[in-house]
Amino acid sequence: MNILNQVILVGRLVKDPELRDTENSKKISYITVAVPRSFKDANGEYQTDFINVTLFDMVAKNTVEYCKKGSIIGVKGRLQTSVVEKENEEKKYYTDIIAEKITFLSSKQDDNLEEAAS
């Protein structure tokens, strides 16, 4: 039996990505990707999902270097769950998308050309 945990998204960055360091000196970036739905809602309008993605190390570094707000990217990754126990012993469950690969479908240069043409 093949077991699969894979997420694929294509969308636009909501803001410029920023690079941070984790406690154990790994590079990390948290991005949000705007992904329009392929169908209209009851009012005849397209909705957009804003999906949070976590990037590590070289994936994070390269995304920060080559992308900015509005860049179109492809994300290939996986879902990862975690549990955080609060002081009152209440457990909070989180599901995150961890990027394994980012494909740059537009670049900062492409975006700058679009702005200059406007």
Pin down the residues of each PLM region.
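Acidic, gly/ser/pro-rich intrinsically disordered tails
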Residues: 1-5, 17-26, 40-46, 61, ...
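A generic structural motif
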Residues: 34-40, 85
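Disulfide-stabilized netrin-like
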Residues: 46-59
